[in-house]
């Protein structure tokens, strides 16, 4: 079985500028998140920007880092970079009513296992929201046959690529 660090190294240099969800998956995503409190992410250069598909939402949420823990706040500008060089809102208005998480990852399996950056930040956050819908977003080229799973890893409910979607449970 391949190590997670080797997988991360292989996936960190991929280019996502041409990524686009198919019309079918845009509709599918909007069906899943319609009229729900959605926490999305502010993409970095290694993550897919799906936020332009979420323009109909007047109030989106996102994550921010506080004492090495992810928390949730309203998505608003301007952005600042945290200590890991990840953008987050400069003004944090905390929220706790999240119903759906749109989650980036370096890779996913069709079984919902996520390969993150190795700090377990999303796993710790998601463990507090067991009833929330968890949707992993990745390019098809980041769909992996297997990712080693640890006890604390949280499975996704769905994984979406450009043209495919996988319901996990």
Model feature map: region roles:
Residues 1-92, 96:
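N-terminal active-site beta-alpha-beta segment that forms phosphate/nucleotide-binding
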Residues 71-169:
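Conserved phosphate- and dinucleotide-binding cores of soluble alpha/beta proteins
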